[in-house]
From Swiss-Prot:
Modified residues (Phosphoserine): S769
Source species, domain of life: Eukaryota
Organism of provenance: Mus musculus
Subunit structure: Can form homodimers and heterodimers with DACT2 or DACT3. Interacts with CSNK1D, PKA catalytic subunit, PKC-type kinase, CSNK2A1, CSNK2B, DVL1, DLV2, DVAL3, VANGL1, VANGL2, CTNND1 and HDAC1. Interacts with GSK3B; the interaction is indicative for an association of DACT1 with the beta-catenin destruction complex. Interacts with GSK3A. Interacts with YWHAB; the interaction is enhanced by PKA phosphorylating DACT1 at Ser-769. Interacts with CTNNB1.
Protein's recorded name: Dapper homolog 1
Sequence segments annotated as region (Required for self-association): 85-149
GO molecular function: beta-catenin binding; delta-catenin binding; protein kinase A binding; protein kinase C binding
UniProt family annotation: Belongs to the dapper family.
Coiled-coil intervals, chain numbering: 85-149
Length: 778
């Protein structure tokens, strides 16, 4: 030590020249190497002292146990004498240990004072060396690496030239006893022993750096202080010292505070030599830090592994979650008004989706919302699809409305999405309130519920000019419209924007009348096709014609456009059919306009399907949907049997959309149902194909899903069509109310044969080869 003290003041004298810098570098490297060696020796000494302490403690424990076993058979006076001797002996040992410790502390203090001058010089050397390395050798990374290493540095692999603060200055003022022992003041073997009374290690390594637990760098292993493994691990750089305070600052390499820390630790050592914490208290004090590190590490790993929730992506997998069921089969088109960023271009499809005059949205706002909102959205998507291809002329109004609706804020979307979740309860109460208004038309079986729908349908064109300016605001009030999935925005939101003929206000009122359908109305299913063609070709004029509520309304071009519309229906329905697959109610519309002789067809708005050569948006159904096909088939047979036997309209049970609210066993049947419709609609133009359509799609949901049974598109159809009604069809078709007991009086028949046309079989095979067997033979 003394040669160091004599030699190290010299580096301060040389000048600033190149030779001085070279000398500084050489001497600095030598000093840092010396400090590393010294640090290693101190760590080794601390480990040896710890092992010695452990040995002595074990020896004392063994002796105590032997004494206890020896005194078992002796008499009480003898045991009392032994206890007195043991107590006196322990007091002597404690006194001896305390004297040794005090002597060692005095020697340490002397060494610290002697080294106080060296600290400043070493710090200067470190600074100069680091500057030289940065300027000349450009090895700042190595410098940082050496700084981050544990200061014990027993197995450090750094080269001798890397002089870092943690390697030099920290080791100088570390509170270990190596300097004491180098001064030839080695004490008796008990110097490292502990005071027996408090079990506190008062060994040579007073430095808490060597008295606390060691944690491996990966955080998996902890070596508690008084243990042989700790004594070995303290010499290895592979472990981190669980310390706060001085040692952490040393590890960070804050050499500027080295002298202050040294003096503070010296004072602490002199003041607290008799009050050092026990190993257990040291562990408890250091354990929170290590546990915090471990918790943070685990949390970071968990956060890395956690996948973000993808709520906005449409999924093709079968899912019972209501929002995912809605988002899964949405169109690629994005509805601009619902808060889509203005940067997204509005394509031709969007323009057609915007063709709804503001009245449609107005009626939506005013109309009550009820649980089948998801179903209404999907059925509206059907209508939307048909209009994409067949209604370019009606896009002028929607195109004019588009710029306004583009400014709907995204917050509106989020708020409305929250409202959607709250509507389950709200919709039920609103549904009850609307049942009162919907029950009154029961008395007039011919045209009862049609009048409100017609009146609203007639008001829509007039409201167009008034509501254009309000289109951005209602987005907040339309929870059913605003799901954030761009991929499904068409099926969720734009469905409401299809045409003014949709009357959403009736959607809740419609449910009580699901069964109030005229059996004869089913025969007028072809009217739906004609009516839809009329809506596509003569929409502006028909829309504004007030019709009497009690009359059947026929469109002027009914007979002319019927065939034409059936052909074109193949175009718009295909994509709508597959996008409908998300919800049970959607599939009904396709079969509706072709089910001329089926009383159970649901009078849903007729939607056309694409021809085969234009169908490009097929989606493959996952194998789990085969169960849904089977269910749909079963229900179709059941409904077919009922309708074939009695040829009357079944009363649908209270609506419960399996996707939106109850994850029932039929939750995927809607997907296969819409699949059937989309495949069946354009199979052929004969009645056999019509028959198959009804069997697979409409009747299935009419019985099992609590869907609407009956072809008429009356007020009760507003629910199944997603809360929107074709006003022309409202005027066109009458209804006859059928009392609810019909459903219960008529037994449910579950085993029925189903005929499928050859074209239908081909189309079903195209989707799922395994499901054809189910559909035709089960």
């Amino acid at each position: 030590m003394k040669p160091d003290a004599a030699r190290e003041p010299e580096p301060l004298s040389p000048g600033r020249g190149a030779e001085a810098e070279g000398r500084w570098r050489e001497r600095g490297e030598a000093d840092t190497e010396r400090q590393r060696t010294r640090e290693r020796q101190e760590a080794t000494l601390a480990g040896l002292a710890e092992l010695g302490y452990l040995r002595q403690r074990q020896e004392l424990l063994v002796r105590g146990a032997l004494r206890c076993s020896g005194t078992v058979g002796t008499v009480a006076p003898r045991s009392g004498e032994l206890r007195g001797d043991a107590a006196q002996r322990s007091r002597l040992e404690e006194k001896f240990l305390e004297e040794n410790i005090l002597l060692l502390r005095r020697q340490l203090n002397c060494l610290r004072r002697r080294d106080a001058g060296l600290l400043n010089q070493l710090q200067e050397l470190d600074k100069q060396i680091s500057d030289l390395r940065l300027d000349v050798e450009k090895t700042s990374e190595e410098h940082l690496e050496t700084d981050s290493r544990p200061s014990s540095g027993f197995y450090e692999l750094s080269d001798g030239a890397s002089g870092s603060l943690s390697n030099s200055s920290n080791s100088v003022f570390s509170e270990c006893l190596s300097s004491c022992h180098s001064s030839t003041c080695f004490c008796s073997p008990l110097e490292a022993a502990l005071t027996i009374s408090d079990g506190c290690p008062k060994s040579a390594d007073v430095n808490p750096k060597y008295q606390c637990d060691l944690v491996s760098k990966n955080g998996n292993d902890v070596y508690r202080y008084p243990s042989p493994l700790h004594a070995v691990a303290v010499q290895s750089p592979m472990f981190l010292l669980c310390l706060t305070g001085n040692t952490l600052r040393e590890e960070e390499g804050l050499g500027s505070h080295a002298s202050d820390i040294c003096i503070g630790s010296e004072l602490n050592a002199t003041k607290t030599d008799n009050s050092l914490p026990s190993p257990s208290s040291l562990w408890s004090a250091s354990h929170p830090a290590s546990s915090k590190k471990m918790d943070g590490y685990i949390l970071s790993l968990v956060q890395k592994k956690t996948h973000p929730v993808r709520t906005n992506k449409p999924r093709t997998s079968v899912n019972a979650d209501p929002t995912k069921g809605l988002l899964r089969n949405g169109s690629v088109c994005v509805r601009a008004p619902s808060g889509v960023p203005p940067g997204s271009s509005v394509n031709f499809k969007n323009t057609k989706q915007m063709c709804l005059p503001a009245g449609g949205i107005t009626s939506l706002e005013n109309g009550p919302f009820s649980p089948p909102k998801q179903r209404s959205k999907d059925s509206k998507t059907d209508q939307l699809e048909s209009k994409r291809l067949a209604l370019p002329e009606s896009c002028s109004a929607g195109a004019a409305m588009e710029p306004q609706s583009k400014h709907v804020p995204k917050a509106a979307k989020a708020a409305s999405q929250e409202l959607t979740r709250c509507q389950a309860g709200l919709g039920e109460s609103m549904k009850e309130s609307n049942q009162a208004s919907a029950v009154s038309p029961k008395t007039s079986p011919g045209r009862g519920p049609v009048a409100p729908a017609e009146s609203k349908a007639l008001q829509l064109p007039k409201k167009m000019s008034q509501k254009n300016s309000l289109q951005a605001v209602p987005a907040l009030d339309r929870p059913a419209l605003d799901f954030k999935s761009e991929g499904s925005s068409q099926s969720l939101e734009e469905g409401h924007l299809v045409k003014a003929q949709f009357i959403p206000g009736q959607q809740a009122a419609a449910r009580p009348h699901r069964a109030h359908r005229n059996p004869g109305v089913a025969r007028s299913a072809t009217l739906k096709a004609r009516g839809q063609a009329a809506m596509e070709h003569g929409l502006p004029t028909v829309r504004e014609k007030p019709r009497a509520a009690g009359k059947k309304c026929r469109f002027p071009d009914d007979s002319d456009t019927n065939k034409k519309f059936r052909k074109t229906s193949a175009k718009g329905r295909r994509s709508g059919g597959l996008q409908d697959a998300g919800l049970p109610g959607r599939a009904l519309g396709t079969g509706g306009h072709r089910a001329g002789s089926r009383a159970h067809a649901h009078g849903r708005e007729p939607v056309v399907a694409k021809p085969k050569h234009k169908r490009t948006d097929y989606r493959r159904w996952k194998s789990s949907a085969e169960v849904s096909y089977e269910e749909a088939l079963r229900r179709a047979r059941r409904a077919r049997r009922e309708h074939g036997a009695a040829y009357r309209v079944a009363v649908a049970l209270p609506y419960a959309s399996p996707y939106a609210y109850v994850p029932s066993d039929s939750e995927y049947s809607a997907e296969c149902e819409s699949l059937f419709h989309s495949t069946v609609v354009d199979t052929s133009e004969d009645e056999q194909s019509n028959y198959t359509t009804n069997c697979f799609g409409d009747s299935e949901s009419s019985v099992s899903e609590g869907d609407f049974v009956g072809e008429s598109t009356t007020t009760s159809d507003s629910e199944e069509s997603g809360g929107l009604i074709w006003s022309q069809f409202v005027q066109t078709l009458p209804i006859q109310t059928v009392t609810a007991p019909d459903l219960h009086t008529r037994p449910t028949k579950t085993f029925v044969k189903i005929k499928a046309s050859h074209n239908l079989k081909k189309k079903i095979l195209r989707f799922r080869s395994g499901s054809l067997k189910l559909m035709t033979t089960v």
